[in-house]
From Swiss-Prot:
MF terms (GO), sorted A to Z: serine-type peptidase activity
Source species taxonomy: Bacteria, Pseudomonadati, Pseudomonadota, Gammaproteobacteria, Lysobacterales
Top-level taxon of the source organism: Bacteria
Keyword Nucleotide-binding: no
Family: Belongs to the peptidase S1 family.
Active-site feature positions: S48
Catalytic activity: Preferential cleavage: Ala-|-Xaa, Val-|-Xaa in bacterial cell walls, elastin and other proteins
Biological process, per Gene Ontology: defense response to bacterium; proteolysis
Coiled-coil parts of chain: none
PROSITE patterns for this protein: TRYPSIN_SER
Protein name: Alpha-lytic protease L1
Known role: Has bacteriolytic activity.
Recorded effect of pH on activity: Optimum pH is 8.0. Active from pH 7.0 to 11.0.
Amino acid sequence: VNVLGGIEYSINNATLCSVGFSVRVFNYAEGAVRGLTQGNACMGRGDSGGSWFTLFERQYGL
């Protein structure tokens, strides 16, 4: 899945929001992602985006 700037996309009830970048997601159900950075994720406290990014942080030790 590619998410381009200004577009929100829902994947398994998690909303991704990119800001001028392309976000490519692989194997979301297992938490594997590529190309996501803090700058292009919606990470509001308590929302699905925040949970999604936390999963990313745990996978890659950020």
